[in-house]
Regions:
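Extended, histidine- and acidic-residue-enriched regions that form the cofactor-binding/catalytic faces
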Residues: 2-86, 90-100, 104-122, 126-267
Length: 267
């Protein structure tokens, strides 16, 4: 029994981010059952005056690592640093990777993961570009799943850590009396504050003025004469906090794990 404890401790502390693993560690992890590859895309885009443009990448890394840890049978692949996004010279700092190019990259990397020995590949994204049932993630996942499932490998698109978790937690905050917000709003800013332990990504001195254009129902036009703020924020981020960010982080991870487990069970 005494000998088993160090082995358990070593397994628990073993790296699960493939960039931090040697090839022998990857081989051992695959042999031990960590055969799910998690691909999570980030992005570089303007996120309001208070948030650095690399927020998607900063959030994606710990999120996908936590998902892998909680699943127990997964390894986090390197975060892809670019994704489809809008661009404007008025708000510089965004870099758009068109959906077709992202699809080519995802397809190649997913097939490489299968060649390496992974039997399940999961595609996820931290940004909205290319997501949804008709988006590039879903398209690539279906194409590769149809191609490889007869040989025992599956490829899935897991969207709920973005779409479902964001919607649900936004509703929770609104019920608690917080303002609604989407891009650069209270959700994004709070999550970045929670993860930004080195104070590199969030300009906390600008939070007091971090309010942008209001969240409107889809299709609703601004009132006549309304002058857009156009600062990269949709909503009101002034009450953002690391405490809210921690709750949101946990909700995103739990939502992703639940969906991925359901997808794995469908094998």
């Amino acid at each position: 029994m005494m000998q088993a404890e160090p082995a358990r401790a070593a397994a628990a502390s073993a790296p699960i981010e493939i960039e931090l693993m040697t090839w022998t560690e990857v081989k051992a992890a695959l042999a031990a059952g960590k055969t799910t590859a998690l691909f999570y895309t980030g992005g570089v885009e303007q996120r309001g005056p208070q948030n650095a443009t690399g927020g998607h990448n900063m959030m994606a890394r710990p999120i996908v690592k936590a998902i892998a840890e909680k699943l127990g049978n997964a390894i986090a692949m390197p975060v892809l640093p670019f994704s489809p996004t809008g661009m404007s010279a008025d708000l510089p700092g965004s870099f758009d990777l068109p959906a077709d190019l992202l699809g080519t990259v995802l397809e190649r990397l997913a097939e490489d993961a299968i060649v390496n020995g992974f039997t399940t590949v999961v595609l996820m994204g931290d940004s909205g570009g290319g997501q949804g049932p008709d988006g590039i993630y879903a398209s690539v996942a279906k194409k590769l799943d149809d191609k490889h499932k007869a040989n025992g490998a599956r490829v899935f698109y897991a969207n709920e850590s973005y779409t479902k978790a964001n919607r649900e937690f936004s509703d929770i905050l609104v019920k608690e009396g917080f303002p609604p917000g989407t891009h650069g709003g209270i959700l994004d800013t709070s999550l970045m504050m929670y993860l930004d332990t080195d104070n590199k990504y969030v300009r906390r001195d600008l939070l007091a003025s971090a309010v942008g254009d209001p969240v409107r129902p889809r299709g609703q036009k601004p009132e006549p004469g309304y002058k857009p703020v156009n600062n990269g924020i949709t909503g009101d981020a002034r009450r953002s906090s690391a405490e809210i960010g921690k709750r949101f982080f946990d909700h995103k991870v739990d939502t992703a794990v639940k969906q991925i487990k359901a997808l794995q069970a469908s094998r």
